[in-house]
């Protein structure tokens, strides 16, 4: 099952969503997508509906 993880890049304030298996760690998700772990925080997990309605980029 995939979950929608909402992240925020701390330097720019940009928010984005990564879809990943529910057993994946935040570090695994960000490393796979090529984001710098030092500058990204996980905010929350969104439902499919919330992710769709957010208008944010989904990786």
Where are these regions (language model features)?
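N-terminal leader/targeting signatures
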Residues: 1, 28-31
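Short cationic amphipathic helices and targeting signals
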Residues: 16-18
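Short aromatic-glycine-(Arg/Gly/Cys) micro-motifs in beta-strand/loop hairpins
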Residues: 1-14
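Short, mixed-charge low-complexity intrinsically disordered segments
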Residues: 31-59
């Amino acid at each position: 099952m995939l979950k929608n993880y909402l992240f925020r890049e701390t330097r720019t304030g940009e928010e984005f969503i990564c879809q990943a298996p529910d057993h994946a760690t935040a570090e695994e998700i960000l490393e796979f997508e090529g984001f710098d772990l030092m500058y990204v925080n996980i905010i929350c997990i969104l439902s499919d509906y919330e992710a769709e309605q957010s208008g944010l980029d989904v990786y």
